Amino acid sequence: MYDIVIIGAGPAGSTLARQISKSKKKILIIDAENEKNKKPCGGLLAPDAQKEFAHYDLVLPKDILVSPQIFSVKTMDLVSGKIKYYQRYYLNMDRYKFDKYLVSLIPNNVKKINGRVVSIKKDDNYILEVLDGTKKKLINAKIIVGADGCNSIVRRTFYDNNIMKYMAIQEWYNCVDSSNSFYSCIFDKKTSSSCSWLIHKDEYLIYGGAFDIKNSKDKFLEQRERLSKFLNIDLNNPVKKEACLVYRPKKFNDFVTGKDGAYLVGEAAGFISASSFEGISCAIRSADILSKIINDNVDIKKITKLYRNKTIKLKIKLRLKVIKRWFMYTSIVRNIIMTLGIDSIKINK
């Protein structure tokens, strides 16, 4: 019997495990990610996430960072043809190495297993069925925390999961021409109500985007063709393809923190920016909030109430991102902003 089982060892799960490890509780963290099963991600550490790291006095080993480092984003509208540049302060990194670094910070008194939770039942406690390779095992826990991102099994099992979702698809290419911008944000209302991206990482170029789930593959391929013509580049021979679901919160009810000993952190709780899909800062923030509450309390009802209340500020911040999204993704408004050059920078070539 474990006091706490954390499902998912991304930034949210790793942070939570590290911060509650000082307690006398028996803790287990379960993660299915490995070299062959990586989460598709642009791998950019935004300023908000960097600030969260600063609160822990953490540093990033240089082998996590990749080349080049980024100072601006090239924003393109494939319909209007407009291009503008905006200053940004992202760290370009290897997301898989980043996640594994965070896992390495978890003390040894927290047990770690690699596996996938396939079902959860509630009895007096929680009973988790875990698939470890070809073997299934049952694990009992007093408290479970879903840190397993979009379509979390904890959220699907116990809570409303009707939050809007996109299919994020990205492809990797061998990069032989780095003459184009190192980081680009792409809008194309003909193929997506969301955005796409181009990012250089060492010897690779990544092209990806978020698409409506219905016909997502066809829309991705259509946009890829349109982008290839727009930039005059060849995107027909990827060396790797990735895809996953991603949440797009629209209302306060999309943010679910949990109750009765089954809690959610990070994207599993809906804590992700609707405008940029940045979720690392929210993952760390929500995990930090829950860890402090768990460390100071044993009563389930009190944990539930405190966690719900102490994440209100985060929920408001993310609700404002929904409003920001309207300005970014409404084509007529975006065209006005780009035409006027609001907040853009000039590039000297």
For each of these PLM feature ranges, what is it?
Residues 33-56:
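Conserved N-terminal glycine-rich FAD pyrophosphate-binding loop of Rossmann-like flavoproteins
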Residues 292-349:
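C-terminal helical "tail/cap" subdomain of flavin- and related membrane-associated enzymes
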